[in-house]
């Protein structure tokens, strides 16, 4: 297999989950991805955006992790979780995928807006990186394999 580096941008979304989903995912229960309505909506959004997670022969590629987010709700907020002045900790599903760094801003804006629409929080945590390099497969011809001598 031939590997080449590809210029991409990283999209990371922090998604609140309940304790049961957190526990199931931590135990490796893959069914929890489909059983949790929020994560299922996030994965549908990934599947609907062909630009996200495109690694050639593999589509809709993502990575995930579990963690906690901490915050204190300020006056004037309309929180989904927590109360004004109270420090709150939320079990969190951290979703990461990549897209081509050359993708135009209109397409990036479209899928980012979609994530904001379906995210349960008043202010979702969505990170977009500057271009970075990640490995991917390259056609054999790129390396002169199989080419006539």
Regions found by a protein language model. Give the residues of each.
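Hydrophobic structural segments
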Residues: 1-149
